[in-house]
Amino acid sequence: MRFIFVNELIKFASKNKNAYLVTSDLGYRAFEKFAKIFPQRFLNVGVSENNMIGVAAGMAMTGKKVFVYSILPFVLFRSLEQIRNNILHNNLDIKIIGAGGGFSYNVQGISHNTSEDISITRSLPNLSVYNPGSRFEAKLVVNLMLKNKTPCFVRLGKAPDRDFYNKNLRCKNNEGLILTKGKELT
């Protein structure tokens, strides 16, 4: 899903000179292509997630379209206060991408696992939460998120990268994804 996500982000950045990607020393393999095409718009702040959020907030206040990326527990749990105070209370158009939801990185231990992220993010003000489950949904989410001018949080799984749905499905922000129309509830 990360590579689908990045390809959509590259398409967007090609048309939008204010699009920036900020990472905290992660995502090199996934974002190598973005960094090569847009070296001046790819920022690595080092292992400093709180500063990453602060930098992103400052950039957004100057009109930049900022995407921040890290492993999910790092970008969310370590930076929650900065996300809440700097991004959400100012309703800044920043997209927070957390990779490896759930137990995707279980080999690295408890510091890399997340099972609480959806409940935490859903309780925060001014935040749209996306949780794609396939490559198709990841592509759909990027396009929905780009139309959304408010803060967004995207939970990307590490694997599997397979599609479950028909590619002709359509979805709008804050609406469910209708798989099949029917008259009975199961």
Where are these regions (language model features)?
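Glycine-rich phosphate/diphosphate-binding loop of Rossmann-like nucleotide-binding domains
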Residues: 186
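Thiamine diphosphate
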Residues: 1-156, 160-161, 170-175, 181
